[in-house]
Structure formats: C-alpha cells, structure tokens
Amino acid sequence: MASDKPRNNDSIGKTLLVVVILCLVCSVVVAGAAVGLKAKQQEQRLLDKQRNILAVAGLLQPRMLAEEVQQAFATRIEPRLLDLQSGEFLKQDPATFDRSQALRDNQMSIALTPAQDIAGIRRRANVVEIYLVRGDGGQINKVILPIYGSGLWSMMYAFVAIDTDGKTVRGITYYDHGETPGLGGEIENPIWRNQWIGKRLFDDQGQPAIRIVKGRAPANDPHAVDGLSGATLTSNGVQNSFNFWLGENGFGPFLKKVREGALKNG
C-alpha cells in the first residue's frame, strides 16, 4: 500500500500540470481570438460608417461590395476636422482624432450648462470630424455634419447632408438609436427622411428655422417637417438636436461661413 503513494502523487502532479498547460493554451487562443475579433469589429464599424455617409451623400449604390464602398469613400468623401468655436478647419489628420477620448478630456471638450444642453448630450467636443462631398470634377457639392441628441429612450445619432449654400438639406440618416420601433423608430423611415430634402435650416436672417411640427407640415413651408405620429418625445429630441447643432455651440459659426461662400471654391 505504501508503495502506491508516490505513484498516486505523481499521477496527481501530472494531472495538475496538464490542467495548467491546457488553461494556458486556452488563454492564449481566447486572447488571440479576442484581438482578431476586435480588429474585425472595428473594420466593420468603419465600413458601416462609410456606407451611411455615402448613403446620405446620395452616392451609395444597391449591393455595393465592401471594396466598392471603400473606393467610393476614398474618391468622393474628404474627412476634415473642424474647430467648432471658430468654425475653421484644422490641419490635423482626422484619422488621429477620437471623439470618445475627446469627450473624456477636459482640455478637448466642454461641459454644457443646463441652459446650453438643449440636446441632452452633457459634453461637447471642441473638435468635430465632418465630411466634404466632391463631385466628378472634384468640386465640393455638399458637406455632411454629424449630429446627435437624446430621444425618448436613447441617444440618436445622425448624418445630415447640406448644400454648399449652408442652409439647404440634401439628405439625412439616423444610423444609431434605440427608439421604439414603429413610433420613434420611424426616424429611419425613408418616407420621413425624404421630407427633409430641400428644406431650409435657416431663415433669411440666418437664424435656425427648421421645425418638426405636430401632424402634417404645410406643403409650402420650406422649414417644416412632419412630426412622428405617436412619438412626440422623439420628435422633440430631433428638434432639440437641430436647435443645438445649428446654434452657436454647435455648427453655427461654421455654417455662417458656408453661407457666406466658404465652400464655393473648394
């Protein structure tokens, strides 16, 4: 009996060694898979972003392959960094800018006061990435601005395409939100989105004038868009988002320069 104890101990030791080795191997495999998956997810997020920008620019064709999306984006879309306070472009490479990081940095963003924070976003980065859309001849024919604000249930993220006159909407797409399907979720509805095309964001005095109205918008009103049926709070969120981002704490200074012709010779 006594002679069996060393062999039992050896067996237990070998078993523990095998378990440790298996754990290490599994850890390496899982870590490697996680790194690879994260890279793939980042690549997919970038592709989705490019698709949404091309879509709002009117450049996304049906069933475009990933390579075609990337090529169209590279040839027709020019990302630029914009200083919101001055309304001027920066020379910094947009690829080096991280909005999430900027919002966490007190030097790169500002906390909004309750009076300022009509969109319910709490903080606003000092710098924003926007997108210039170029035609076949290389001339700028649109600018795409990212806007976001609180809806009923979620933060609603959109891209808005604006003419080089700085006031006429050429397209809008809400690409990320958590509003109620069939109600507030109708911000994704192409019929509702198409109503925005041709609407004027500003009045003749340069004041924000776009309005989400309850019910049907008057056909001859260049500033009015139908409200979302059964989704008053989501409609209010859209209105508040535009009020903020068209104002002095958003893209107001930049769009004033655009209305004065800043992009006409781009």
UniProtKB/Swiss-Prot annotation:
Enzyme's top EC category: translocase
Modified residues (FMN phosphoryl threonine): 232
Location, primary (coarse class): membrane
Keyword Transmembrane helix: yes
The protein's Enzyme Commission number: 7.2.1.1
SMART domains cross-referenced by the UniProt entry: FMN_bind
Bilayer topology term: Single-pass membrane protein
HAMAP family, A to Z: NqrC
NCBIfam families: nqrC (TIGR01938), PRK05346.1-1 (NF003746), PRK05346.1-5 (NF003749)
Described function: NQR complex catalyzes the reduction of ubiquinone-1 to ubiquinol by two successive reactions, coupled with the transport of Na(+) ions from the cytoplasm to the periplasm. NqrA to NqrE are probably involved in the second step, the conversion of ubisemiquinone to ubiquinol.
Self-association and partners: Composed of six subunits; NqrA, NqrB, NqrC, NqrD, NqrE and NqrF.
PANTHER family, alphabetized: NA(+)-TRANSLOCATING NADH-QUINONE REDUCTASE SUBUNIT C
Protein name as annotated: Na(+)-translocating NADH-quinone reductase subunit C
